[in-house]
Amino acid sequence: KKLIDFALEIPIEFDGCNFTNSLYAIYHARKNLVNYRKDEIISRAIQCLNHSMNHKIKGSGYSFHFKSCQKNYYTQKVSNGGNQADIHGTGMFSLGIVIALKLLGDFAPKGSEYWKYIKT
């Protein structure tokens, strides 16, 4: 319960990692607490799904930052930036979308069953 409380109290920073990390923590913490703060969790999932579209690049993937691909990965420069998709943003937002859809449960839209959370 404390982890769910903590995750819901923190405002989401909408970049690839923070977006997904928030949902990931809630998803795993609520496995045995399905009804705990359920409405707030559903609200958070919807908020994340709606915001993820701000990072979607038409005809491509997702940009890690709003209107900017990731410039550095840890200490290495990986691009000059720009409003384009990048592999890290696409991977993290795809995972975040899957988790958000799972958190919606019965409220998930039709077609969400095709989004899978695959553990490797």
Placement of each model-derived feature along the sequence:
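Terminal, non-catalytic domain-edge segments
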Residues: 1-120
